[in-house]
Amino acid sequence: MATTEPSVEQLETKTAKLKLENTTKRDTLIELEKKYQQKWQEEKAFEVDAPLEDVPIDELRKKYPKFFGNMPYPYMNGALHLGHAFTLSKVEFTTAFERLNGKRVLFPMGFHCTGMPICASADRLSREIEMFGPSFDVPEEKEEEVEVEVKTPNAREDVTKHSGKKSKAAAKTAAVKYQFQIMESLGVPRTEIHKFADAKYWLSYFPPLCQRDCTEFGLGIDWRRSFITTDVNPYYDSFVRWQVNHLHDSGKIKFGERYTVYSIKDGQPCMDHDRKSGEGVGPQEYTGIKMEVLEFPEAARKALQSIDLSNKKVCMIAATLRPETMYGQTNCYVGPNITYGIYESNVPNELFICTRRAANNMAYQKLSKERGVVSELGTIKGQDLIGALVNAPLSVHKQVYVLPMETVLATKGTGVVTSVPSDSPDDFATLTELRKKAEFYHLNPEWMKYEAVPIIRTPSYGDMCAEFLCKKLKIQSPKDVKQLAQAKELAYKECFYQGTMIIGKYSGEKVETAKPKVRKELIDQGLAFVYNEPEGQVISRSGDDCIVALCDQWFLDYGEASWKAVTEKALDRLNTFSPEVRNGFLKTLDWLSQWACARSYGLGTRLPWDPQFLVESLTDSTIYMAYYTICHLLHSDVYGKVPGALNIKPEQMTPEVWDHVFRQAPKPKNTSISDEALARLCREFQYFYPFDIRASGKDLVPNHLTFCLYTHTAIFDEKYWPKGIRANGHLLMNGEKMSKSTGNFMTLHEATKKFGADATRLALADAGDTVDDANFEEALANSAILRLYTQEAWCKEMMENLDNLRTGPYNFHDKVFENEINQLIESSREAFSATLFKAALKSCFYDLQNARDWYREVTADRKMHRDLVCRWIETQVLLLATFAPHWSEHIWLTTLKKPQSIHVSGRFPQVSSPVNTALSNSLLYIRTLSRVIREAEAAQLKRQKKGKGMLFDPSKPKRLTVFVAEKFPEWQAQYVALLQKYYNESENKFDDKAIISSVDKKEMKRAMPFIQQFKQSVINRGEHVSANSIFSRELGFNELEVLREVKPYLVRNVGIQELRIVLLQKPADKSSAAIGLVESGSDAGATVEIAPNFANTVPGQPTFLFENVSA
């Protein structure tokens, strides 16, 4: 297998934006990474099995806790990119953390090959070989490439269905270029590309590259448990056949006609994984209204004169989502610039007028003369149809006219729109415009004579909601597109959910119940039919613009009431790690129904009971996580060609054996597998299953991940249902969408080559943790290289020079540092446990190093303590092992001289003692002091320039006096009590009216600034700070003692000759100034008067005075 390896220079030209100037440090780190990757491979560091002790599983797990993490196996039609790595990192970080907690961690990965993408690409290559030969010698005139963007409209416009927005990173673009050029962009030499015309060659080429890239990335994967999907692997093939047989036998898989997105070119349904664009788009069901043409205008008669329309019923077909509004039709709209066709329908002597696109859909929905055949008799411009007289089914106005509408789309619906201006803001705005400018549009006013008819009564918008909303939103014309879109959504929701019919036989009924009845009536009377088309544009992997077809097919009956109920139960028990993901599941369960589970083209497993079909790729990938637990015992290679440790042959894995292993059925009577082997299979499954976390992109919630829940509930006992599913957002790069065409793109292999594995991992950890778009910053990855290199050198230097460090009892700064280490251990543990890796990285890397730097600075005059330096290094190594395992392993073994790998003997660090709040508060106080002192100096100089305050020259030797207080002014206590009385903790709000009315008017000037400041301190307090702790006004430490301890540091840091501390003893009153005692300074013990501007000092908020002193 050969790949074209770019040089470092080529890599930096090809990928993203950042060019590395000096790579010595990076190269050193990469050299270490290669060393330890080889070591882990030789030591089989990540290979893990269930314990062999013969005790019940629950006892076994208690004695040997386990953790099983995984992600959807990547598709093998290319190299992994940073988006894959981002999701992989979520599993990697979680499992690495659990390994440090002493658990037996299983992290496997398979290779997905099922479906049509590989076959479609192979077929394209075959055609290109026919065109250009195996060397792909393209004539110069054909070399030009054209880039087009495929835009997918918002998925579902019907508000009765779930809809989701695509993020910035999710928008897909399709490049019109040759497949062999795509292969070259993947690093495949042109001389080898012809081999990929054989679909199965892909299966041998990309899996090894995937494993290489993951290994270079430092992932802790048990590669023994890898496999490829499809019938190429007979063991996995047997597993999938067992799975679908169970679903079929239990009635979960059914056969029948259903509407599905379909590729005419491929001749089969086009499921999510078969699409180049339009993932998540499904069929949109309309009611096709037959508006029989009663009289054509002169222009239309001329255009159609070559077509024999005698004895023919010609119907303009209007597709509507709101059949209940047909009572109020006043006219019909066409796009004047759209070309319409006249097509033979499935009814003899009946012709349809609609767009060609709609006719393509109808031809595969039993609405044409012959399935799959569009019988077009002729075409006509929309302009020529204006003025036609048509029948309006159910309408109060039986016969209406055709009018122009510029906003009618040829790519949506049928191109014909029936107008109901009472309830459609678009229709109302257009009709109003046409009436105003009838002469301009060359329209006969007679064509617009019908007034809007009240159809639906709504509580918010009355009986004519379209007119109401157009006035409310100040819509002046059809060109107010934004406001009309808003009005349309508001009208639809209000009418459907709150509206009541006020006309017709269903008058008095809620719209929700009347809508299907009106629709049925129209269809039963032959006035309408069911019509489907894709909700948005769907482009297949083969480049086909897909339609919706009515197909006889095997489908999974997702949404069936009892199955849905038990799946909802599984969701209730599932840890989704965020409310957005749970809501995504709930919405999917609301709309998800029948899903085609078979196809006729592609790679995969044959349906056991109907082998002409293959199991589709979102069906064979729902419970394979269970297969991970035992596959290393079945086969020793990913293709299943070599039997595994138990020497079991594929044909021995009968349905009864699978049942015994996965469903605890009785031991098969006729199996040739030994009892010991069966017991081993059962033990591996029962010990590791269910999985604890499955990380995935959020785009899989509406399909794969929900299917995963459904299938688990159908096949497994409750105790084996999934425990956790974590979804992440898409990954941007340098703040922009990843795109090969712009160069803002990077494969995983390129990233580890450019930055090294550990630096790449750190940048991915920092990228983000929510379901929103995350961002990989190259600059951060680059800075991580320097940080790791520098820290390694510092750790080595310290451990080699321990004798130069201080020993003996801990002083104040030692205790504060030790406490901060403990605090960061706890915050890191909390973040890791919640899979909040950006927060974990901040605590265990940035904050921990800042803590060390601070400690080094405050102890500069007395040196750091030897024991604490050693503890910090070991803590840093263990905490960072999750993110930077190679770096940590190196220091663990070579600097700390540990005898075993960190993956074997390393454990998440424990606190040396509970976190001391007083020490934490002291540290926060100290770190704030330097900043506040500098601000005070600047403020004093500013006042001095205005002629206020004591003269002071900052360039000369200076003394700083710090004024502190032990008690709050007595007058403030009553207002603190008042604020506490009128504080609502659940809403984090104060009753301002009650507070103001309780304050004496004479006290307003003094009280209100204090009240406002105190309110803000309560409202804006930290997440882990209670309101009571603010109201208590307790510092939690002795301010005077802390100041004494940090005095040497402040003298150095602030650059002063002397630090003087004055304690406020007696507050000022009307007859005398405030009095203070000098606690520290050249005049210690003296009693001094305190100037008024310093007399308002309160505990925790000292005030400062700078003075010049003689050198």
UniProtKB/Swiss-Prot annotation:
<dbReference type="InterPro" id="IPR014729">
    <property type="entry name" value="Rossmann-like_a/b/a_fold"/>
</dbReference>
<keyword id="KW-0067">ATP-binding</keyword>
<dbReference type="Pfam" id="PF00133">
    <property type="entry name" value="tRNA-synt_1"/>
</dbReference>
<comment type="similarity">
    <text>Belongs to the class-I aminoacyl-tRNA synthetase family.</text>
</comment>
<feature type="binding site">
    <location>
        <position position="740"/>
    </location>
    <ligand>
        <name>ATP</name>
    </ligand>
</feature>
<dbReference type="InterPro" id="IPR009008">
    <property type="entry name" value="Val/Leu/Ile-tRNA-synth_edit"/>
</dbReference>
<dbReference type="InterPro" id="IPR004493">
    <property type="entry name" value="Leu-tRNA-synth_Ia_arc/euk"/>
</dbReference>
<dbReference type="GO" id="GO:0002181">
    <property type="term" value="P:cytoplasmic translation"/>
</dbReference>
<dbReference type="Pfam" id="PF24810">
    <property type="entry name" value="RBD_LARS1"/>
</dbReference>
<dbReference type="InterPro" id="IPR002300">
    <property type="entry name" value="aa-tRNA-synth_Ia"/>
</dbReference>
<feature type="short sequence motif" description="'HIGH' region">
    <location>
        <begin position="74"/>
        <end position="84"/>
    </location>
</feature>
<dbReference type="InterPro" id="IPR009080">
    <property type="entry name" value="tRNAsynth_Ia_anticodon-bd"/>
</dbReference>
<feature type="modified residue" description="Phosphoserine">
    <location>
        <position position="460"/>
    </location>
</feature>
<dbReference type="GO" id="GO:0005524">
    <property type="term" value="F:ATP binding"/>
</dbReference>
<keyword id="KW-0648">Protein biosynthesis</keyword>
<keyword id="KW-0597">Phosphoprotein</keyword>
<keyword id="KW-0436">Ligase</keyword>
<feature type="short sequence motif" description="'KMSKS' region">
    <location>
        <begin position="737"/>
        <end position="741"/>
    </location>
</feature>
<dbReference type="GO" id="GO:0002161">
    <property type="term" value="F:aminoacyl-tRNA deacylase activity"/>
</dbReference>
<keyword id="KW-0030">Aminoacyl-tRNA synthetase</keyword>
<dbReference type="GO" id="GO:0005829">
    <property type="term" value="C:cytosol"/>
</dbReference>
<dbReference type="GO" id="GO:0006429">
    <property type="term" value="P:leucyl-tRNA aminoacylation"/>
</dbReference>
<dbReference type="Pfam" id="PF08264">
    <property type="entry name" value="Anticodon_1"/>
</dbReference>
<dbReference type="InterPro" id="IPR055416">
    <property type="entry name" value="RBD_LARS1"/>
</dbReference>
<protein>
    <recommendedName>
        <fullName>Putative leucine--tRNA ligase, cytoplasmic</fullName>
        <ecNumber>6.1.1.4</ecNumber>
    </recommendedName>
</protein>
<keyword id="KW-0963">Cytoplasm</keyword>
<dbReference type="GO" id="GO:0004823">
    <property type="term" value="F:leucine-tRNA ligase activity"/>
</dbReference>
<dbReference type="InterPro" id="IPR013155">
    <property type="entry name" value="M/V/L/I-tRNA-synth_anticd-bd"/>
</dbReference>
<keyword id="KW-0547">Nucleotide-binding</keyword>
